Regions:
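Phosphodiester-processing cores and adjacent nucleic acid-binding clamps
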Residues: 1-166
Length: 166
């Protein structure tokens, strides 16, 4: 399967156009194997902070999981791992072979690394006017063209904020 990333996603902050919450969108994108996603709400950036913070939180949790699984993998490989029946998180390990435990660790390490690599792309679907702001023309100017603008880096993000705020 080829990599695919949505570069034009509306959230609940796009009135009449989007209804999905940011956590559900991010979770679904990660579950579907996407390496990133761009939030481009209509004429606003109200969901950008929530989007960025949620991805940051997901990555933080994945980093903790990665460390846990890497430590467990090292113990299994060295022959020092013995599942403790008293620990809830180790009950499923009882009776599994070393190869099964190694495969499980490697699978979970790969999953955690994938989440850590997820890229939040910040953007906006802007409205492009037919005329200058001083030369408005009633109905014609109420229907405009749309332009998807994505921030490439922090400077681009700040420029995007300036554009949306005008």
């Amino acid at each position: 399967m080829q990599d695919f990333v949505h570069l034009h996603v509306h959230t609940q902050y796009s009135v009449l156009d989007g209804q999905s919450s940011i956590p559900r969108l991010v979770d679904k994108a990660i579950k579907n194997g996407m390496r990133g996603m761009a939030v481009t709400d209509h004429g606003n950036m109200m969901g950008i902070k929530e989007f960025y913070n949620y991805v940051k939180k997901k990555k933080s949790g994945a980093k903790d999981e990665l460390k846990k699984w890497e430590d467990k993998l090292a113990l299994i490989e060295s022959g020092q791992y013995q599942p403790d029946p008293a620990r809830k998180d180790q009950k499923d390990d009882i009776g599994k072979s070393k190869e099964e435990l190694l495969a499980l660790c490697r699978k979970n390490i790969e999953s955690a690394r994938f989440v850590i690599s997820f890229k939040p792309i910040l953007g906006c679907e802007m409205y492009v006017a037919h005329h200058k702001m001083t030369d408005r023309n009633g109905k014609e100017d109420q229907s405009g063209w749309h332009l998807i603008v994505l921030a490439k880096n922090e400077k681009g993000y700040h420029n995007l904020i300036k554009l949306v705020s005008r």
